Swiss-Prot record:
DNA-binding region: 197-216
Every HTH luxR-type domain range: 173-238
Key words, A-Z: Activator, DNA-binding, Quorum sensing, Transcription, Transcription regulation
Family indicated by similarity: Belongs to the autoinducer-regulated transcriptional regulatory protein family.
Keyword Transcription on entry: yes
Matching PANTHER family: DNA-BINDING TRANSCRIPTIONAL ACTIVATOR DEVR_DOSR
Protein name from the UniProt record: Transcriptional activator protein BjaR1
Organism: Bradyrhizobium diazoefficiens (strain JCM 10833 / BCRC 13528 / IAM 13628 / NBRC 14792 / USDA 110)
SMART domains reported in the protein's UniProt record: HTH_LUXR
SUPFAM superfamilies linked to this entry: C-terminal effector domain of the bipartite response regulators, Pheromone-binding domain of LuxR-like quorum-sensing transcription factors
Gene name tied to this protein: bjaR1
Functional description taken from the UniProt entry: Transcriptional activator that functions in response to the quorum-sensing autoinducer IV-HSL (isovaleryl-homoserine lactone). Activates BjaI expression. Is sensitive to IV-HSL at concentrations as low as 10 pM.
Amino acid sequence: MSAVDYGREALDFIEGLGVYRKVPDAMNALEAAFGRFGFETIIVTGLPNPDQRFAQMVLAKRWPAGWFNLYTQNNYDRFDPVVRLCRQSVNPFEWSEAPYDAELEPSAAEVMNRAGDFRMSRGFIVPIHGLTGYEAAVSLGGVHLDLNPRSKPALHLMAMYGFDHIRRLLEPTPYPSTRLTPREREVISWASQGKSAWEIGEILHITQRTAEEHLATAARKLGAVNRTHAVALAIRHKIINP
């Protein structure tokens, strides 16, 4: 598919997810949407602190029961190189990009190898870092995946909005004020087209720093944790037209 086709897939997903008011129904929608990219497993979860258990952080999942039991009983999250990189990265990445030394870190190698036993030999994870320090992720796994430079931005957007929707279903809170200024709507609109803060500044004849400030303010008003999340929410609330 072209970048436009992937973008349309993401927008259709965002526009349709709002009708689901129960977590199982929303997860069915996520499963169907990500399934079109070849993914067979999904987990939406917080990342535990040292004094927390992984199982208590999970918001929703479509994992094989055997893998979830194995993962939690062996505390694999303590050794998982994907979780480790997720804490350090703000950008989504393929599981294979998470570094580890198989000889020095046999537990990390065990996690990655055993995942393959459950048709999770490849994957893609979207880190989520909240303004208050909350760490979470949407992790997708499978075997034959449609992962390329055109599909990844769409998956990023879909995962961010999917996380937000699941979280709000579990913890209903009023949406923050979405009264953006015309300039804030402009910068979010350009951001939705993949423009960087520098490029937005050039287009609008403002400095890069000013563009970044407008993006940050818009994200805060929308209750977003980052720029991609802000774009997803702005589209969902019809503040901008993609």
